[in-house]
Design a protein with these regions (language model features):
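Bacterial N-terminal signal peptides that target proteins for export
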Residues: 1-10
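C-terminal motif of bacterial Sec signal peptides marking the signal peptidase cleavage site
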Residues: 17-20
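N-terminal leader/targeting segments and the immediate start of mature chains
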Residues: 22-79, 279-290
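Solvent-exposed loop/turn segments connecting transmembrane beta-strands
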Residues: 75-79, 99-106, 186, 213, ...
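An acidic-aromatic
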Residues: 93-149
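C-terminal low-complexity, charged extensions that often adopt amphipathic alpha-helices
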Residues: 137-171, 286-290
Length: 290
């Protein structure tokens, strides 16, 4: 089996998560104007009016979520699997540690409200990408809150702190699920929600491009586990199509807890070499080779 630089795996994972969210264009300006125009007659209650408030009320009240993690990437000509952990502090940070041979921390990914940090501890390299200084992130208005919602299994609308029923159309899909849909100028989002638990079971983001190979991301949840009065997914599976080759990332979680005794910011060793975005993209292109 080929030995691939750990940063290549770390970078691939990081860019996957960014790609899964980059489709969410900010609606902050639009939301402001909508708020100013809400002096309208009350509308007839809809299925979304019933479902969305129950989902929001059921969101976890925990400030922290931590878990052990099994992390696998399949696609782009590679199959990779490592252990690790995930640590999250609400409204602040998401950290993922990738562990080789069950004992060595080989890579780390950190998402904050301001930047993405990816560290290759084996080769002593790192890349730090401030959202507002990377063109493709800034132009798509990537929002940390969207990424957090995906990991915490919560409903979201980009550019809003809390979504409302008015943001969605709702249609029953079978006897046990309802599909919530939201669309903006460039992208469409659907959330498959269980009527028995009011949890998100799948999020799909689709480009509105007429192209047959338009980008599409499916973010699926499974194996829900009771935790702190809430159900947290024991597995997240992400499928990305519309790339040169399909890509899948699977994360399986165990020992879900609310540990708060950890550093919420990763410190980069002064001896590590910082690499640039172009270097990262070159590594990703190599992953797609034969």
């Amino acid at each position: 089996m080929k030995v691939i630089p750990v940063l290549s795996l770390t970078a691939l994972c990081g860019i996957l998560f960014l790609a899964s969210c980059r489709s969410h264009k900010s609606l902050i300006k639009g939301n402001t104007s909508q708020t100013e125009q809400k002096a309208e007659p009350a509308h007839k209650a809809t299925l979304a009016d019933e479902v969305v408030p129950k989902m929001i009320a059921g969101n976890s009240k925990a400030g922290y979520v931590t878990a052990k993690m099994k992390f696998a990437v399949s696609g782009m000509g590679k199959d990779l699997s490592v252990g690790g952990s995930i640590k999250m502090k609400r409204d602040d940070v998401i950290q993922m540690s990738l562990v080789a041979f069950s004992i060595i921390e080989a890579g780390k990914i950190e998402f904050t409200k301001d930047y993405v940090l990816m560290i290759d501890r084996i080769n002593k390299r790192y890349i730090k990408l401030p959202y507002n200084k990377v063109d493709f992130l800034a132009s798509t208005h990537l929002d940390f809150n969207v990424l957090q919602s995906l990991f915490w299994n919560e409903l979201f609308v980009a550019g809003k702190t809390t979504p409302s029923a008015a943001d969605f159309t709702a249609v029953k899909s079978g006897n046990n699920d309802v599909t919530l849909s939201h669309k903006d100028e460039s992208f469409a989002y659907t959330f498959v929600v269980g009527l028995a638990d009011y949890l998100v079971h799948q999020v799909t983001v689709t480009s509105s491009s007429a192209s047959s190979n338009a980008a599409k991301v499916d973010w699926r949840y499974g194996d829900f586990t009771a935790y702190n009065g809430h159900s947290y997914p024991g597995q997240i599976s992400i499928d990305v199509t519309g790339l040169k080759q399909p890509l899948n990332v699977t994360m399986k979680f165990s020992r879900i807890n609310n540990d708060s005794d950890w550093e919420t910011r990763v410190k980069v060793n002064s001896g590590y070499q910082q690499i640039e975005l172009n270097d990262l993209l070159k590594m990703l292109s190599k992953l797609g080779g034969n």
